């Protein structure tokens, strides 16, 4: 079994990329894994052979040597240190089964359609809270698998095309004798597609796609929040053999702000005020993300932790009308350094205190005295 060509064992073409080789290996390993075929020596031999093949082809240096010299490149020198290690790549039979279960349960006896939708892509974009407030248009750069300009996605060299696979006669499946059983499997020549390219495109090597560098403009609407997902339809990877392109998803990450915290569409901020303003009342001016200065009235006797609200001064509602609220939490600041005059005035104030000025503190100490003395 191991005398077969490694590419044939893995049912891939010699031009297959690493992802294609890995996918095919996992599919075959799931099919022939000893846990799934107890007591089947043929399946065990097949499993060892595909593991040997994958251990070689997954390593760029080993693959290059194999492509040039075949197995002779590894004779007499200890080889690769023992084949069969590829099985550890997936951890166990259950992992293989989970990764390729969908493919295994696919229809039998029919060629797998060569038309496939392109993969979706993800791009993570960081913006500031100010940018989330106002919205903006940003340019992003990505590398994406796009339709090959040379063959226009056909995978075939100009002047040539696809033809029906002579091995499976277009069915995409072949039957293989294994011991007393005949099993059906994907055609190793056309990889289950039912068609082959006789003269591959030299630019994309028959894939029909090439990686391209693209610059895209992304419109960030006002009001986006951390975790908002924006879809750019058709900007993902190009489809295979005429299939539709995937989508590009922009995931928004809003960096923390030094002053404001966001909760839904409301903006919160801690605002310190002097103890005299807290006692006597007054007003403060609070800047917002829209550049406006909002005047907030401070009632006399306000305490630390009290929240004051300015309606309609928060974040814009995404794809809607109106805005959230601006909510400020008052932090009364006690002076740490006093002039002689200020200390004198505060001493005079203390001499005139009756306890009614701060009912909570006087009530607390009265209650504590009652608890401790019983009076």
Curated annotation (Swiss-Prot):
Presence of the UniProt keyword Chaperone in the record: yes
Gene Ontology biological process terms, A to Z: chaperone cofactor-dependent protein refolding; DNA replication; protein refolding; response to heat
Ranges for the CXXCXGXG motif repeats: 148-155, 165-172, 187-194, 201-208
Record localization: Cytoplasm
Co-factor requirement: Zn(2+)
Co-factor: note: Binds 2 Zn(2+) ions per monomer.
Binding, Zn(2+) 2: 165, 168, 187, 190
Cited Pfam families: DnaJ, DnaJ_C, DnaJ_CXXCXGXG
Domain J: 5-70
Zinc finger (CR-type): 135-213
One cellular component term from this protein's GO annotations in UniProt: cytoplasm
PROSITE patterns referenced in this protein's UniProt entry, alphabetically: DNAJ_1 (PS00636), DNAJ_2 (PS50076), ZF_CR (PS51188)
HAMAP family per UniProt: DnaJ
Alphabetized PANTHER family for the sequence: CHAPERONE PROTEIN DNAJ (PTHR43096:SF48), DNAJ HOMOLOG 1, MITOCHONDRIAL-RELATED (PTHR43096)
Record NCBIfam families: DnaJ_bact, PRK10767.1
Name used for this protein in its record: Chaperone protein DnaJ
Source organism: Zymomonas mobilis subsp. mobilis (strain ATCC 31821 / ZM4 / CP4)
Gene from which this protein is expressed: dnaJ
